[in-house]
Amino acid sequence: MYPAGPPAGPVPRRGRRPLPGPPAPAPAPVPAARPPPPAPGPRPRVAVKMAFRKAYSIKDKLQAIERVKGGERQASVCRDFGVPGGTLRGWLKDEPKLRWFLEQLGGEVGTQRKKMRLANEEEIDRAVYAWFLALRQHGVPLSGPLIQAQAEAFARQIYGPECTFKASHGWFWRWQKRHGISSQRFYGEAGPPAPSPAPGPPVKEEPALPSGAGPLPDRAPAPPPPAEGGYGDEQIYSASVTGLYWKLLPEQAAPPGAGDPGAGGCGRRWRGDRVTVLLAANLTGSHKLKPLVIGRLPDPPSLRHHNQDKFPASYRYSPDAWLSRPLLRGWFFEEFVPGVKRYLRRSCLQQKAVLLVAHPPCPSPAASMPALDSEDAPVRCRPEPLGPPEELQTPDGAVRVLFLSKGSSRAHIPAPLEQGVVAAFKQLYKRELLRLAVSCASGSPLDFMRSFMLKDMLYLAGLSWDLVQAGSIERCWLLGLRAAFEPRPGEDSAGQPAQAEEAAEHSRVLSDLTHLAALAYKCLAPEEVAEWLHLDDDGGPPEGCREEVGPALPPAAPPAPASLPSAMGGGEDEEEATDYGGTSVPTAGEAVRGLETALRWLENQDPREVGPLRLVQLRSLISMARRLGGIGHTPAGPYDGV
């Protein structure tokens, strides 16, 4: 192999043979290489104290920036905060970003943040936070579901109706943490408690309420709160009371001499057919409460086993079908106060409202007093006077009632809803009643009277109240205020332009009523239709016509021939059923039983989906089947018209 090193002697030239000479001396021995040092063993670990990384808040960063701007040396600032110089210079460079981030969050909440991280949907976040601050400045309490619903509404407004943004509980929690908002339970937001007044005389205990009235508050109501800016248009409500013959048709309202001779010359009219209706709405007409219907029946059969909360109108019982003091108090605390608070909360308004109530018109004793020898009859039919306004308000005084004055013609303040809204409601109700009567044209008016029940009346009352336009309610307030503050008779021409639209709507409804009455009754004059419309405008029936004092009686059925059976399932005619196409024709009793089964099933469905039209038509078919089959109508049956 090749030598490890260069040759010891001179290197011969190429191409020449080396000259002979003495042999070269042997090379000196190379000393052996030192063995490598042994590998060092594991060194003992020495504990080194590492500095913890600290995240500084935006407040600390801005304080360091202000100290540097104030002329302090950066070295001393770094020493105080425990940061290197590069970190401090990075803070100085990011000062505009820090200021902008605080503006986005708002308030002192953002100074505690350590990371500049905004929401994924910045526009929705800013809109919800601005809306939240605006409402809290007015003292409106807000809940989590309400804020989440408003966030989804803002998302649809910003990104369009196809936006899929969902304000979940996680989003709401992050929104709270981002803006430093905490959830608290409010038991009241009243001001400092007023000094307790001196003890007064004992208060007389209120009488027991009927089944339809609500409980009285446990404590005496507090004085009304001081007016902080007054009430807005949506916080001012008005209520009016009116009477209504709920199932009276034009044929039964014929003038004296034109009706049934056996009815005393004033047509068929029953005491149980008249009810009292309470209507309430705010000034703008944007919130209309459910009508309150007061009747003489304590437990109407048609309302049994039904959830009355689903009906568009409420029913209460009164012996004289009038709005008594306990009924008004129960309606105020059970329906008006909860409904108004829900509306104000949904509209993001302050939780306060006022209700203007006109004293119900008392019918004259000559018109409403029954012809009885008993001395307690006039007292029973006379409406009970309403209490003072101080007794009708919530314990905190936020929602209260003011009664309009009722004195001389000059000092009397008319109720706003009495300036055409109540009359429009009655006309719309009677138009829908005539439509139902015309739709049941297959039977006689007697069949319709038996098939139209109080449950259908509640549905028609709610439908008619919904048909009253909000603009009509708002304009009626202008008429009422003009009559209250300018009672001079020579200044009635100022409201003519505002009444043009009302007159057009009024004429259209009257035209519909006349047309429907002509379809239902061929020989009915327009004057008779007008008299039927204004029959229940006064406190009682017209002069010369007394209401029957006994219980509500169904109209007298036409006499049945002696050959017809008087009970269901009896008679020889039912046994002689003929065959038609191999199938026996059902008897009248079987047909009535089948229709009644279908009616019971239909009545247990949602009344908002079924509607009164189909129910009335089915009852009319049952009444017609009874009449054609000669089956007697049982007084205790479910089709007594109530």
From Swiss-Prot:
The keyword Repeat applies. It is found in: Nucleus. Residues 233-357, 410-477 form the DDE-1 domain. Signal peptide: none annotated. Keywords: DNA-binding, Nucleus, Repeat. GO terms for cellular component: nucleus. Its main location: nucleus. Residues 74-94, 145-178 bind DNA. InterPro entries: CenT-Element_Derived (IPR050863), DDE_SF_endonuclease_dom (IPR004875), Homeodomain-like_sf (IPR009057), HTH_CenpB_DNA-bd_dom (IPR006600), HTH_Psq (IPR007889), WH-like_DNA-bd_sf (IPR036388). Residues 1-10, 19-43, 192-202, 218-227, 552-562 have a biased composition (Pro residues). Residues 47-98 form the HTH psq-type domain. Residues 112-185 form the HTH CENPB-type domain. Residues 1-45, 185-233, 535-587 are annotated as: Disordered. Belongs to the tigger transposable element derived protein family. This is Tigger transposable element-derived protein 5.
